[in-house]
Regions:
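Amphipathic alpha-helix from the class-I
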Residues: 193-213, 224-229
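Active-site PLP attachment segment
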Residues: 136, 142-176
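Active-site phosphate-binding strand-loop segment of PLP-dependent enzymes
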Residues: 66, 70-124
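Conserved PLP-anchoring active-site segment centered on the Schiff-base-forming lysine
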Residues: 33-52
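Short loop-beta-helix segment that forms the pyridoxal 5′-phosphate
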Residues: 8-32
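Conserved PLP-binding catalytic core of the aspartate aminotransferase-like
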Residues: 213-222, 228-256
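A glycine-/small-polar-enriched, mobile loop at the entrance of the PLP active site in fold-type I
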Residues: 1-5, 182-187
Length: 256
């Protein structure tokens, strides 16, 4: 338990949040987030390309559900207006920080501005950014120099590569989740060796400016090499580099 609290406190400090709560995986974190916080009188507005764990977590809660076309701020505002018109008590906007299939970044500054305008909360799954995006690897909000209300993330990628997930946010939210998030209450805690590895990985991340620079140099080199060979890529700088093949059978053949 001491190791777990040490890692939770370290994650909260690293991410600039009040506190954090650990889960066995980020799938569990996203699955346990929405139901304790949002009821039938509330609304959740989700990006159309959000990760499956966010989609499943939203399905488990009783809030009214709205969806906006991915990164379409005009459509997001339309859904915010609809939620307001439908009498939503509380509204939460949920998005990936980086979309896992194409490496594009959510428009967090614009999302935050709309959230402030309509009195909505913001939730960001930053699994594909924490550890290497933004100053000191603090993720997509830090990359954009903005803030969000709730962050979820994983220990299974840049923060160690084994397993584990977390939710970081305001103290009242984390306190409530400790009492009501079912994947936290009714599942196993992280093994102590994984927790200790997460603490060590976080220290490496905080001191990893040289490694982060090398990662983006490698990604740029790989993008150039693929482009020079005639492959079609989506624009971007993120280490997720989608190759657009345009045909299902060709994609299966390439995967082999």
């Amino acid at each position: 338990a001491d190791l777990h609290r040490e890692l939770e406190s370290a994650l909260a400090r690293f991410l600039g949040m009040d506190d954090a709560i650990l889960f066995a995986a980020c799938f569990d974190a996203n699955g346990g987030l929405f139901e304790p916080l949002l009821g039938p009188d509330d609304a959740i507005i989700s990006d159309a390309l959000n990760h499956a764990s966010i989609i499943d977590g939203i399905r488990l809660c009783k809030a009214k559900r709205y969806r906006y076309a991915t990164s379409d701020m005009e459509d997001l505002e339309t859904q915010l207006k609809a939620a307001k018109s439908d009498g939503a008590r509380h509204i939460m906007i949920a998005t990936d920080g980086v979309f896992s299939m194409d490496g594009t970044l959510a428009k967090l500054p614009e999302i935050k501005a709309l959230a402030d305008q309509y009195g909505a909360l913001t939730m960001v799954d930053d699994c594909h950014a924490t550890g290497f995006m933004g100053p000191k690897g603090q993720g997509t909000p830090a990359h954009f120099n903005t803030s969000v209300d709730i962050l979820t993330g994983t220990l299974g990628k840049a923060l160690g590569g084994a397993l584990g997930g977390y939710i970081a946010g305001p103290q009242p939210v984390i306190d409530l989740l400790r009492q009501r998030a079912r994947p936290y209450l009714f599942s196993n805690a992280l093994p102590p060796m994984i927790t200790a590895a997460g603490i060590a990985a976080l220290k490496l991340v905080e001191e990893g400016d040289i490694l982060r620079a090398r990662l983006f140099e490698n990604a740029a080199h790989w993008r150039k090499g693929l482009t020079d060979q005639g492959f079609t890529l989506l624009d971007g700088e993120h280490p997720i580099i989608p190759v657009m093949l345009g045909e299902a059978q060709l994609a299966q053949d390439m995967a082999r």
